[in-house]
Amino acid sequence: MKDQKVIVALDYDNQADALTFVDKIDPSSCRLKVGKEMFTLFGPEFVKELHKRGFSVFLDLKFHDIPNTCSKAVRAAAEMGVWMVNVHASGGERMMSASREILEPYGSDRPLLIGVTVLTSMEQQDLAGIGLDIAPQEQVKRLAALTKNSGLDGVVCSAQEASMLKADLGKEFQLVTPGIRPAGADVGDQKRIMTPVDAITAGSDYLVIGRPITQAENPSQVLNEINLSLASVL
């Protein structure tokens, strides 16, 4: 199966609505992201429903805790059979290393383990508000390097940082990019955004796209158009 680049962010507070949407799209066209709200509302059974329909799932819970607790949460995600799971890189090297090591018994079946650097809604004044006198891009570089040194597979980052991180950390280090909006789509609450083609060209490996697909009249068509546009740069 080809490596789908698009990850559709499912942001629903009603499980029936979510599954109605999911049944309109093809598992060969994308992967799905389940975040905190949906997982808190619907739990592991919802992830199982997505797996039954043939979708790979990115469990976007951004674990951040002491190493023992965080690593056990990551192991629970692996037991669920998800394709990708993430942790906050600001949790530090010991937390990330413990989370990576606990996945060793799963071999090639283990989920990709991704670090979260700087949330795409954060600007320099937001970082200053939590005591970090540093530009977002510099904090991303610092946390991404820490993530790689901890043995993780990649990071979540904005597309603007993708080319820099590929140059610094190598082509094998996976970059997962939210804040992606097809040309002409509403920006929403993401501060640092880019189109799908621009993001892949810049070095992003996977693109997280939500409302432009989930709120489309014909989500399957939107997905096909995005994938066709990406075919020219892959």
From Swiss-Prot:
The lineage of its organism: Bacteria, Pseudomonadati, Pseudomonadota, Gammaproteobacteria, Vibrionales. InterPro entries: Aldolase_TIM, OMPdecase, OMPdecase_AS, OMPdecase_bac, OMPdeCOase_dom, RibuloseP-bd_barrel. This is Orotidine 5'-phosphate decarboxylase. Keywords: Decarboxylase, Lyase, Pyrimidine biosynthesis. GO terms for molecular function: orotidine-5'-phosphate decarboxylase activity. Belongs to the OMP decarboxylase family. Type 1 subfamily. HAMAP family: OMPdecase_type1_B. PANTHER family: OROTIDINE 5'-PHOSPHATE DECARBOXYLASE (PTHR32119:SF2).
